[in-house]
């Protein structure tokens, strides 16, 4: 295994402040160099973090698109410029190349501690399997959504998102901070074990594969005209079947799920997703058998 440097990003969204605190605290207590691997810690969007807002011009976590990161676009938006800086500094061809990136986020939804993967890269599966095997964390596999692209971790050869909630934006929660510290510490230990052939991957990986997103009920003017149904609030990862309630509109009408397939909702009522016209996303459950190729690809980094 030739991994030499791993990038830990917090504050990709400026109002998600708990991982920033956790990283600062962790970095004071732990050596950035561990078992031959150097760990780089950086605030993804420092200007937004100082202002306490999600972003300045556009979502940084949708700004890692090749077509938008070309030279003529560098000065268009702050986040586009910032994405280019991060790639120039820490990208695989950057001045301090990192082979792996871990992006730390919080959510206002009741997601607990979870992993988010983008696509089916074997290296990512290997990394996620280490954490799911240790903590039993649910994995949200986001793929094939043309409306949502340009995620930070996709710009590196290997990476994943750690998502923890529920917690309000710009609110420090010691329990959330402790969870981040535990995950960062454990991930470092698990990578070291894998590097020294001291750990085996689980036989299978359970993932929740993104299928789409559902908007709030809206009136003829496009204004939100319904709330998430009381039975659905805080029920992330809980199965939904045909006929189960999703929303309660202003007329008292219950909007029910009318699909034939079982689904599992995620990011229910996430505040930041209102602007994206998303009340919740939904997934299907899939079990993926582990492959030796996962470790081989990871070791090739």
From Swiss-Prot:
Q: Which reaction does it catalyse?
A: an N-acyl-L-aspartate + H2O = a carboxylate + L-aspartate
Q: How and how many cofactors are bound, per the record note?
A: Binds 1 zinc ion per subunit.
> Its Enzyme Commission number?
3.5.1.15
Q: Quote the Pfam families the UniProt record gives.
A: AstE_AspA_cat (PF24827), AstE_AspA_hybrid (PF04952)
Q: Which residues bind substrate?
A: 54, 61-62, 163, 273
The cofactor required is: Zn(2+)
Q: Which UniProt keywords apply?
A: Hydrolase, Metal-binding, Zinc
Note the superkingdom of the native organism: Bacteria
Which terms in the GO cellular component ontology are assigned? cytosol
- Which residues participate in Zn(2+) binding? 13, 16, 105
Q: Its Gene Ontology molecular function terms?
A: aspartoacylase activity; hydrolase activity, acting on ester bonds; zinc ion binding
So what family is this one in? Belongs to the AspA/AstE family. Aspartoacylase subfamily.
Name it: Probable aspartoacylase
- The organism named in the record is Prochlorococcus marinus (strain AS9601)
